[in-house]
Amino acid sequence: MFNIDEVYTISSFLSVCNKTIENNIPTCWLQGEISNLTRPASGHWYFSLKDNTVQVRCALFRFNQRYIKFSPKNGIEVLVRVVPTLYEARGNFQLVIQQIEQIGIGNLNLAFKQLKKDLDNEGLFDNIHKKPLPNTINTIGVISSSTGAVIQDIIKVLNNRYPFVKILLFDSIVQGQDSIKKLTNALNIADQSGKCDVIIIARGGGSLEDLWAFNEEILARAIFNAKTPIISAIGHETDTTIADLVSDIRAPTPSFAAMLVTSNRLELLSNTNKLYTQLHQSYRQTLHYYQSRLNQLKLKISNPNKQIDYLNQKLDYLSINLTTRKESIFTLNNAKLNSLFTTLKQHSPIKTIKHAKSLNQMSLNQLKYQIKQIINTNNNMLYLATERLQKIIMALTNKHKARLSIQANSLHYLSPLNILARGFSITSDTKNQVLSSVTNIKINQTIITQLDNGALYSNIEKIEKN
């Protein structure tokens, strides 16, 4: 606040003025024409914004330029979001620009925001409507231009990671007046064909006008109504379209979309080999157990051959005894012979042998039945083990796919190149020492500014401390 009784210095007066402006005039949108545009080596842009009667100085600093999709020029009409401020070093009133758009681009943005709001209110973006990817993907439909680099990138990634998958290209132009009709028709054909397990709709980066077909309501509703899971891979990561919001999954790039729908074949082969080894070991252990069990059961079952041998030996003994004594027995007592004959008949070895054979056959039948039961039990256990293995393979596949997705996202967001791509830079001296303060910099010193796609070499003309 101003104190009418205080005598101010110029710097303190301008400081109070600046604070008064910043605290009382909010951020606002202005429309005007660019003039007197200058672009010094610092990377900041300075120009005047004018209408038919007045003009005002504006500053667009480098860190606010990262999302600008056009090159400002003198004479073009723009829509700017500004913060009023006072440049105290010279006492000049100026507007610091936070956002700038061409007038035509501004209309597209308004249309985008309105459609986004309407579809969001209808629930088209709600997660409850998002379809999950199938566990097994054999055929991938791709909606893109057959002559663009996007389809080649997708094919390359799929061939490297999982060459067994089938790719169906539904060719369509991806920008221009007829693109929305072509894209929608291609999507409907791919979805209604029933041949695709998942559909990728993709194109490379471009301006808002280039990507506008993907912001049309007709395409958004076609994606929402599709029965097949849809993955959008449109533009760069910083580009967000209506199609991205309504799709089941949004991939930052077409190549990443191809990675999402495939598993690494080497990893799958390795996991399959491990599971096969585990299954083989389990099978051998189970087989060994039941073989031991079978041997134990065999020992418990008496051998009928021993009984037969015993009876045969007894028969031989009786025959010999009968031969040596038959004369004396015959002469001694015919009645006793008849009695013995009757006794022998009652204890006929043939009858005993038949009975022993009958017991032997019953034992064999029982043994066959038990062996058959053991085999059936083993087959059931093998079937259950195979089924359990399939579930384990499926679970491991899903687990590694989720882990790969998380790791890929983490790697992408932690990449230093990604930071540079968002408009940040790294400044160092000619000895590659990173400069984080103006205290270590001298006038006429050469500094190097590292950007995403190259480096800038600058000479220091002036140093201002905050």
UniProtKB/Swiss-Prot annotation:
GO MF term list: exodeoxyribonuclease VII activity; nucleic acid binding
Residues making up the signal peptide according to the UniProt record: none
Q: Name one GO biological process term.
A: DNA catabolic process
EC number(s) reported in the record: 3.1.11.6
Keyword terms: Cytoplasm, Exonuclease, Hydrolase, Nuclease
Q: What the protein does? A: Bidirectionally degrades single-stranded DNA into large acid-insoluble oligonucleotides, which are then degraded further into small acid-soluble oligonucleotides.
Give the protein name, as stated in the record: Exodeoxyribonuclease 7 large subunit
Annotated source species: Vesicomyosocius okutanii subsp. Calyptogena okutanii (strain HA)
